[in-house]
């Protein structure tokens, strides 16, 4: 069901059994897979490619222009896999250059107020706590847990199954299977 009060471009490719609520905004160069739910006031911008079975909650912006001084208007992409839950007020930027991509894998849970910046690559089955900020060009593995208010500085890498505790800010890589805590970051567990 697509609400007649949603603004959906006729050029957008919308899959089967997609629900788009009133006041959602979907631009021309967008692909939304089957069985997705787009709640009110969501904006899905050009260059966004979304798989199936995703839920996107109110006031989220997907595929926003990158917050990067190097951006010159390239037609870049945001790729979102299948089965993700993207809660309220999340912003995910697309890549800076036309040959780049921001990638969100499958079955991730992004809680309220998360920001994922340009050219970041996120694996699968990760949890991003409230207000977590992932800067540009980061690489996040699989099954990582970010507690609330974590800040990952540009170019950081996080290995599989790491856990980052609330309020941690880091600019160096977090190895797999590590508990990271504090500011500046230190390792435990």
What residues fall within each predicted segment?
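Conserved beta-strand-loop-alpha-helix hinge in the C-terminal portion
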Residues: 183-189
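Structural signal for interior beta-strand "rungs" in well-ordered beta-sheet cores
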Residues: 2-181
């Amino acid at each position: 069901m697509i609400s007649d009060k949603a603004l959906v471009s006729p050029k957008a490719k919308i899959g089967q059994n997609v629900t788009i609520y009133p006041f959602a905004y979907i631009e021309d160069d967008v692909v939304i897979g089957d069985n997705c739910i787009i709640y009110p006031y969501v904006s899905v911008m050009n260059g966004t490619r979304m798989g199936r079975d995703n839920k996107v909650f109110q006031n989220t912006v997907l595929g926003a222009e990158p917050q990067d001084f190097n951006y010159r208007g390239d037609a870049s992409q945001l790729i979102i896999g299948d089965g993700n839950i993207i809660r309220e007020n999340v912003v995910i930027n697309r890549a800076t250059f036309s040959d780049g991509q921001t990638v969100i894998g499958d079955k991730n849970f992004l809680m309220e107020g998360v920001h994922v910046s340009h050219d970041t690559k996120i694996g699968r089955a990760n949890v991003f706590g409230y207000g977590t900020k992932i800067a540009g060009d980061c690489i996040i593995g699989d099954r990582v847990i970010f507690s609330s208010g974590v800040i990952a500085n540009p170019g950081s890498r996080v290995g599989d199954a790491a856990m980052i505790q609330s309020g941690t800010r880091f600019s160096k890589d977090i190895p797999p299977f590590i508990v990271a805590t504090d500011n500046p970051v230190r390792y435990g567990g």
